[in-house]
């Protein structure tokens, strides 16, 4: 048990270093980082979303929901499809301000604005991605300056549920949703049920080796 705890702590420290390294972030995302607001630049779910963005780079109008402090996915998509119209949004004003500065620094021409889910959105998109907070609030053991980047309700699905209940209205007829979740916190069967209960067709589930995160590709039924 002691060995397992030590291994777990070591893995956590390694992952934290990787996700807070400016050099690794540039190698993985081709984005330079200067100012940051918290020390986790991206997570394991973001990596799987990147894989799916590469598979759907022909989409022209992309909404990066919950873009965080750098709008990493929005900026990355603009790099792989320079003709795309990209909008990145987040609920935190501080993240929006920092993302705007970072996108200018990296010379990525994308739209970045503050919005609580779709509250400030009035157009439709070919592609919407979301990496919602999915850590159950029942496991909350730390005080964060920006808690909405990590914690949801007691089961970890309320934010995703709220998103899915609105997202249909903001998709073009052939539009798709890429929903990122982490099965370490929310089991895959719970994710699938959530999708079906909200009237979506599950096209596929994308995974990566040694990664508990998944991306569910959805279409409106």
Task: Walk through the language-model features, giving the residues of each.
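Short amphipathic alpha-helical segments
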Residues: 100-101, 140-144, 190-192
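Conserved SAM/SAH cofactor-binding pocket of Class I
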Residues: 47-122, 127-130, 135-138
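Short, basic/low-complexity N-terminal boundary segments at the transition from targeting/disordered tails
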Residues: 1-14
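SAM-dependent Rossmann-like transferase core, predominantly class I methyltransferases
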Residues: 12-79, 211-217
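Conserved Class I SAM-dependent methyltransferase catalytic core
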Residues: 159-215
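Conserved beta-strand termini and adjacent loop/short-helix elements that scaffold enzyme active sites
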Residues: 36, 113-115, 205-208
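Short, conserved glycine- and acidic-residue-centered signature motifs
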Residues: 41-46, 92, 156-160
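Mobile active-site "lid"/loop adjacent to the S-adenosyl-L-methionine
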Residues: 132-159
């Amino acid at each position: 048990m002691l060995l397992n705890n030590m291994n777990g702590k070591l893995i956590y420290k390694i992952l934290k270093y990787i996700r807070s390294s400016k050099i690794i972030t540039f190698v993985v995302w081709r984005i330079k980082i200067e100012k940051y607001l918290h020390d986790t630049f991206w997570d394991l779910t973001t990596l799987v979303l990147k894989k799916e963005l590469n598979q759907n780079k022909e989409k022209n109008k992309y909404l990066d929901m919950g873009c965080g402090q750098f709008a990493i996915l929005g900026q990355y998509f603009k790099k792989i499809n320079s003709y795309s119209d990209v909008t990145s949004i987040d609920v935190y004003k501080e993240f929006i301000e920092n993302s705007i500065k970072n996108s200018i620094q990296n010379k990525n021409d994308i739209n970045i604005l503050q919005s609580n889910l779709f509250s400030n959105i009035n157009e439709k998109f070919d592609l919407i991605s979301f990496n919602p907070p999915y850590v159950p609030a029942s496991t909350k053991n730390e005080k964060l300056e920006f808690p909405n980047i990590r914690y949801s309700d007691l089961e970890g699905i309320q934010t995703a549920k709220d998103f899915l209940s609105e997202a249909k209205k903001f998709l073009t007829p052939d539009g798709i949703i890429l929903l990122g979740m982490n099965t370490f916190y929310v089991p895959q069967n719970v994710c699938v049920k959530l999708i079906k209960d909200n009237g979506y067709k599950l096209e596929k589930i994308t995974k990566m080796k040694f990664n508990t995160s998944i991306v569910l590709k959805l279409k409106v039924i």
